[in-house]
Amino acid sequence: MSDSEVKDVPVAPVEEVEAPVEAPVEAALEPSVEAPVEAPVESTVEAGEPAPERTRKHIESDDDDEEVQAPVEEQVTIDSSEDPKSQRQILEDRLDRLLKKTSGRRQRADEHDLEQYLDEKILRLKDEMNIAAQMDIETLNKRIEEGENKSQDKKPLVAIQKVKLLPKVMSILSKANLADTILDNNLLQSVRIWLEPLPDGSLPSFEIQKSLFAALDDLPIKTEHLKESGLGRVVIFYTKSKRVEPQLARLAEKLIAEWTRPIIGASDNYRDKRIMQLEFDSEKLKRKSALDSAKRKKNKVSKPSSSASKGSSAQTLYEQAAARRNRAAAPAQTTTDYKYAPVSNITSVPTNARTVGVGSSLNNNELYKKLSSRLAKPGKRS
């Protein structure tokens, strides 16, 4: 082989290798859409094979891609034309409306469940109170039936079921948020049963009385609650019984006054209170006091012994001892209840008077004259 033939042999494959190498390099540098279209066309043209269907296929795919991308671009341009703040506000408003609807439903459901739970709790406590009261009554009845025939070996029967349950009852009655639930479920009926006298005529323990009356004072009890529970009759009994402690009797009277005020239409405001008034006549009082003193003198002259005995009986032991020693006695404290109030005469005072100090009624002219006369004196200026 000659040198020219040797040179020609490797050249042909080099050209064939370079052609497919250049195409992918150009395809990699060019855009992704044009690269797959141009590379196959060059290869088919070089090979001499017809490729109309292949080129059409790529063209059709490009058209489809443009058609698909067109509405997306339009949608993006429509959204971008709006203010992003307004879009964010619209989304936030929608979310708020959805959250409010769900939260309102949940809140109503939670409130309903809570009310149902509280009602069941109060009703269970009511049953426990009634059972405890019934057990104490049965215990007292057994003790009455046994009487003196019981043996010394047996332990005495003590009714302590209500005392055991009292802390739980007070923990419920002392909660202000349960006041409406307590009144609606008629728990006052069980309170009435606890405050009623026992079969042997005795009253409940002092701790039960004091705790329940304090709880009743805090509850907003109305007339319909009293009618439904019958509590008013028991409280009236506590106001009239002599076995009740004075402080509890006063508290019972206070409760009765508060409960009966709306029934009789009375107001708790002092300004609305009706006060009977009576005009005071000083001359009439003087005449009456003179007549009384004359009668006393006449009685002393006619019946000295009887008057002395009456005077001694009217006096206290301290006053009698002071009279025997010829000494003065300190006046004793007395409680006076007035029925009539004096008629006010403040309206008779002239309205144009200006008070300067206590008891003075100098008008502006007199005050000015007095000040000017003081300033006119030479000794007062210094």
From Swiss-Prot:
Residues 344-360 have a biased composition (Polar residues). It is found in: Nucleus. Residues 51-60 have a biased composition (Basic and acidic residues). Residues 1-87, 289-360 are annotated as: Disordered. Its main location: nucleus. GO terms for cellular component: RNA polymerase II, core complex. Transcription factor involved in RNA polymerase II transcription regulation. May function in both SPT15/TBP post-recruitment and recruitment steps of transcription. This is Transcription factor IWS1. It comes from Candida glabrata (strain ATCC 2001 / BCRC 20586 / JCM 3761 / NBRC 0622 / NRRL Y-65 / CBS 138). The gene is IWS1.
